[in-house]
């Protein structure tokens, strides 16, 4: 008799995705981050659901409702900090996942890659709106500064900002709609994840060598299920350590001050995972130019497949490209550091240099290096 997992209409889909899926035998730990992101999304949706049961999206009570969750709700503090630090783990895994795709040439699967970019934007939007909900000082001023960037759009900018705010400033209407969208978007993300996986399973996974691995495949279960479970344990241990020992390590102390439109914090900055983009935004003196650079810093990923000039897919056997890749990582870390610093000398010039380098590496140096490597190998 045929196994039910191979015949049942629903179980068959799960079986073909998680059990009998043929996977390359050479996948390294860099291929763990997809499943880790799935776990992060699950944790965020669950903790977020329980938090939403106690949260009120009203300017008068939002801050107090978060305090109430931490003080009066059973394990409310745990839910709140798991959700806040879970977002940080989400972005760590997300950036490592994108980095893996860049390094090993996974972007040549264009549909999977483009859905991934959409997912990145959706997760960033969700995180931004979530940061506004506790209604602390940094929530309020972060929302004001970031939404105000849309006013740089010619002709419709000002009207667009007021339309998003639901008034003439960030207020009750803004908080209510941000809560609604923050609740809705993770489910849209979950749906996009399904599409992401659908396109991935059309082509099969890439592998570290970048060479087709059709003759050498192994079943996903038990080999990669056990490998993924080890990844889950490591990530959940790290998340637990962060939540239980230093839950406010990655947060901003200003967010423990209730939102006050009459008092601006000395340094307005987003959460750490947006600092690199924030640094690029601030490095351009022109408002519209800064906004364009901010959007392009992520959207540039969409043209990476077009800029792929190498005859090899992966960077595994391309030492010159590897050097450039790690330089790009260093530039991104520098931008993250600069984003959290005040706008003064020498941080301004460091930020501008790093911003120019970021675009230069991706748009010019990487394609040129790929062409050089082709010539070195007489291709």
Swiss-Prot record:
Give the note describing cofactor binding and stoichiometry: Binds 2 heme b groups non-covalently.
Q: Where in the cell is it found?
A: Mitochondrion inner membrane
Single GO term (MF): metal ion binding
UniProt cross-references to Pfam families, sorted A to Z: Cytochrom_B_C (PF00032), Cytochrome_B (PF00033)
Q: Where does heme b b562 bind?
A: 83, 182
Q: Which residues form a coiled coil?
A: none
Record field: transmembrane: 33-53, 77-98, 113-133, 178-198, 226-246, 288-308, 320-340, 347-367
Per the record, the domain of life is: Eukaryota
Signal peptide residues on this chain, from the entry's feature table? none
> Which parts of the sequence bind heme b b566?
97, 196
What is the recorded membrane topology of this protein?
A: Multi-pass membrane protein
- The main place the protein resides is mitochondrion
Mind naming one GO cellular-component term on file for this protein?
respiratory chain complex III
Biological-process GO terms, alphabetical: mitochondrial electron transport, ubiquinol to cytochrome c
Q: Which cofactor does it need?
A: heme b
Assembly, per entry: The cytochrome bc1 complex contains 11 subunits: 3 respiratory subunits (MT-CYB, CYC1 and UQCRFS1), 2 core proteins (UQCRC1 and UQCRC2) and 6 low-molecular weight proteins (UQCRH/QCR6, UQCRB/QCR7, UQCRQ/QCR8, UQCR10/QCR9, UQCR11/QCR10 and a cleavage product of UQCRFS1). This cytochrome bc1 complex then forms a dimer.
Q: What else is known?
A: Heme 1 (or BL or b562) is low-potential and absorbs at about 562 nm, and heme 2 (or BH or b566) is high-potential and absorbs at about 566 nm.
PANTHER family recorded: CYTOCHROME B (PTHR19271:SF16)
UniProt lists the family membership as follows:
Belongs to the cytochrome b family.
What this chain does, per the entry, is described as: Component of the ubiquinol-cytochrome c reductase complex (complex III or cytochrome b-c1 complex) that is part of the mitochondrial respiratory chain. The b-c1 complex mediates electron transfer from ubiquinol to cytochrome c. Contributes to the generation of a proton gradient across the mitochondrial membrane that is then used for ATP synthesis.
Protein known as: Cytochrome b
What gene is this protein translated from? MT-CYB
